[in-house]
């Protein structure tokens, strides 16, 4: 899906890592929450509360998911799942445009 219709958008951005990662929350008509964001090149660690699906819209990054000892490269058009109550490491190689979907328990 390349666009979302009839959404509620939160005006204030989520800003992390001194502005190198930012996102905005959108809420779909069915209550589903997503964030649309950008990441600048760098290395980051994020923690999750809910399960997340990260969809790569542009760029590439290396991802080390929970339980793995190795980084895997994800590029435009790919996605990966992150379990709830965990953390994951990123090595962003170029500007990344992403959509994160949150899966409620």
UniProtKB/Swiss-Prot annotation:
Its family? Belongs to the nucleoside phosphorylase PpnP family.
Q: What would be an example GO MF term here? A: guanosine phosphorylase activity
User: Which InterPro entries does the entry link to?
Assistant: Ppnp (IPR009664), RmlC-like_jellyroll (IPR014710), RmlC_Cupin_sf (IPR011051)
Task: Kindly report, in one word, the top-level EC class recorded for this enzyme.
Answer: transferase
Catalytic reaction annotation: a purine D-ribonucleoside + phosphate = a purine nucleobase + alpha-D-ribose 1-phosphate; adenosine + phosphate = alpha-D-ribose 1-phosphate + adenine; cytidine + phosphate = cytosine + alpha-D-ribose 1-phosphate; guanosine + phosphate = alpha-D-ribose 1-phosphate + guanine
Q: Which organism is it from?
A: Clostridioides difficile (strain 630) (Peptoclostridium difficile)
UniProt keyword Lipoprotein present: no
Q: Which SUPFAM superfamilies match?
A: RmlC-like cupins
UniProt xrefs under Pfam families: Ppnp
Coiled coil feature spans: none
**Name of the protein this chain belongs to:** Pyrimidine/purine nucleoside phosphorylase
Domain of life, per UniProt, equals: Bacteria
User: Which is a Gene Ontology cellular component entry for this protein?
Assistant: cytosol
The EC designation for this entry is 2.4.2.1, 2.4.2.2
Keyword Ubl conjugation assigned = no
Q: What does the protein in this record do?
A: Catalyzes the phosphorolysis of diverse nucleosides, yielding D-ribose 1-phosphate and the respective free bases. Can use uridine, adenosine, guanosine, cytidine, thymidine, inosine and xanthosine as substrates. Also catalyzes the reverse reactions.
Q: Which UniProt keywords apply?
A: Glycosyltransferase, Transferase
């Amino acid at each position: 899906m390349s666009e979302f219709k009839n959404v509620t958008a939160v005006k204030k951005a989520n800003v992390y890592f001194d502005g190198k990662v930012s996102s905005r929350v959108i809420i779909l008509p069915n209550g589903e929450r997503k964030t649309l964001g950008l990441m600048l090149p760098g290395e980051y660690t994020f923690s999750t509360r809910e399960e997340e699906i990260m969809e790569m819209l542009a760029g590439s990054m290396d991802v080390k998911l929970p339980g793995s000892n190795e980084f895997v490269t994800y590029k435009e058009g790919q996605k990966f799942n992150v379990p709830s109550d965990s953390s994951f490491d990123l090595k962003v190689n170029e500007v990344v445009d992403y959509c994160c979907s949150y899966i409620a328990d």
